[in-house]
């Protein structure tokens, strides 16, 4: 299985790796690991659709039997028995389908959560220092849960309903070859309409997940930094910021609802139902079909209602799940330039520190430190004084490679810290920080 690999600051041995080249490939690689549960769900879906088709066919036969000159009560009873048996079997198949997809959904959620957690352990301290905690928590909890919902009820209902689309295609021609026309045209138009619906829904669901992440990020920061907020009398400003983020999330959710309200397949189904019934009645008037066959054919067309109605919810859930998977992958695949450097320098540390023309900046912002040079001898005590935001903490974090210098070199015992084994470097450095909080 092809995977995306990267350097890590910390690694945990894993026996299983997954394809991270895209959200669909990634989700599929997780599903493939649980193929027995997927096969169980698909088998249950096929059996459920087959048993659902039995009822209209038997009802049509019962109608012809009742309308005959000498109806047989015994035959009617046998039809009733077969209907009852088929629906009991259908219930069993539904249970197998639901159990299989719920099983795979829970296992995939477990594996995704574990994969994300191990990946976050391997991220550098630079990453965790700059990445908002609230956004990480939103991806690690709610987005992972959306991947669960992608399988159940998402794929559970989609795969279960797709079989209902094809049952009329196979059963209708047995009454008359021309009767395949209506369900065939409906299926083709349904696929086109559904494709356009999903394409238009993708950016909306991405915005829903992104807005939720931003809302969660700001809320987490406000709660963690509540002392700072109250100390600066910024309660009203924080309420305003939270209100704007909540409004953004609300607008995205409303837009998703508006797009779902314009779901075209519901209209196409009702048109197909009317056209199909009219076609069957024309054949009945011509003596080609009998009353029981008309009833059976109309019952087969009614099977199209399930995939049409359920896809309104199910495909939205799949789109949300893929949006969540996309956000999780973006977090896991984010570049990490800091490596453990297992083969690096790791002698006993003496404690000499030297900064040579060191400059550092956060992302695309201006330099936090610029062309800084000084030396500290072993045993020497140095006090660094400056106002908040002047770069004091940043300077100390360059020594243990929480950050790497943008320009210049930081040396410990005469060697660039990049040449040191990371564990050996940090094991010999102690840092005690004051209780501070800076908003992102």
Model-assigned labels for residue ranges:
Residues 211, 231-234, 267, 304-331:
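Cytosolic ends of transmembrane helices, especially the final helix of ABC transmembrane type-1 domains
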Residues 340, 348-440:
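ABC-type nucleotide-binding domain
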Residues 54-61, 89, 155-198, 254-296, ...:
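A hydrophobic transmembrane-helix motif
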Residues 1-53, 67-79, 97-101, 105, ...:
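Membrane-integrated ABC transporters
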Residues 114, 119, 129-134, 207-255, ...:
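Loop segments that connect adjacent transmembrane helices in multi-pass transporters
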Residues 38-93, 173-178, 287-291:
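Transmembrane helix-loop-helix hairpins at lipid-water interfaces of multipass membrane proteins
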Residues 23, 31-34, 97, 101, ...:
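Juxtamembrane loop-to-helix connectors within ABC transporter transmembrane domains
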């Amino acid at each position: 299985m092809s995977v995306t690999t990267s350097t890590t600051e910390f690694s945990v041995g894993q026996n299983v790796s997954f394809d991270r080249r895209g959200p669909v490939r990634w989700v599929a690689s997780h599903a493939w690991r649980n193929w027995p549960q997927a096969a169980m769900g698909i088998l249950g879906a096929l059996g459920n659709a087959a048993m659902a088709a039995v009822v209209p066919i038997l009802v049509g036969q019962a109608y012809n039997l009742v309308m005959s000159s000498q109806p047989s009560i015994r035959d009617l009873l046998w039809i009733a028995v077969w209907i009852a048996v088929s629906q009991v079997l259908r219930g069993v198949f539904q249970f197998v389908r639901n159990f299989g997809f719920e099983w795979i959904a829970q296992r995939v959620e477990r594996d995704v959560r574990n994969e994300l957690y191990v990946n976050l352990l391997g991220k550098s301290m630079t990453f965790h220092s700059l990445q908002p905690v609230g956004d990480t928590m939103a991806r690690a909890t709610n987005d992972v849960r959306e991947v669960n919902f992608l399988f159940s009820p998402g794929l559970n209902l989609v795969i279960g309903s797709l079989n209902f689309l094809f049952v009329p295609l196979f059963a209708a021609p047995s009454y008359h070859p021309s009767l395949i026309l209506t369900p065939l045209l409906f299926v083709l138009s349904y696929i086109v309409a559904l494709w356009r619906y999903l394409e238009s829904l993708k950016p909306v669901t991405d915005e829903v997940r992104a807005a939720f992440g931003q809302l969660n990020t700001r809320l987490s920061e406000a709660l963690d930094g509540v002392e700072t907020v109250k100390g600066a009398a910024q309660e009203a400003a924080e309420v305003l910021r939270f209100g704007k983020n909540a409004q953004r999330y609300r607008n995205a959710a409303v837009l998703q609802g508006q797009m779902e309200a314009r779901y075209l397949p519901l209209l196409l189904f009702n048109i197909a139902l009317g056209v199909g019934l009219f076609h069957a009645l024309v054949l009945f008037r011509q003596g080609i079909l009998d009353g029981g066959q008309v009833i059976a054919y109309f019952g087969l067309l009614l099977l199209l209602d399930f995939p049409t109605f359920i896809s309104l919810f199910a495909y939205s859930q799949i789109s949300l799940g893929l949006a969540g998977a996309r956000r999780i992958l973006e977090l896991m695949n984010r570049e990490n330039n800091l490596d453990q450097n297992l083969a690096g320098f790791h002698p006993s540390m003496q404690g000499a520190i030297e900064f040579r023309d060191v400059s550092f900046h956060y992302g695309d912002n201006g330099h936090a430190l610029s062309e800084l040079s000084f030396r500290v001898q072993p045993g020497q005590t140095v006090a660094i004084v400056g106002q908040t935001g002047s770069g004091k903490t940043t300077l100390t974090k360059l020594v243990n490679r929480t950050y790497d210098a943008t320009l210049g070199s930081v040396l410990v015992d005469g060697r660039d810290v990049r040449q040191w084994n990371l564990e050996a470097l940090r094991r010999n450095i102690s840092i005690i920080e004051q209780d501070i909080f800076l908003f992102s």
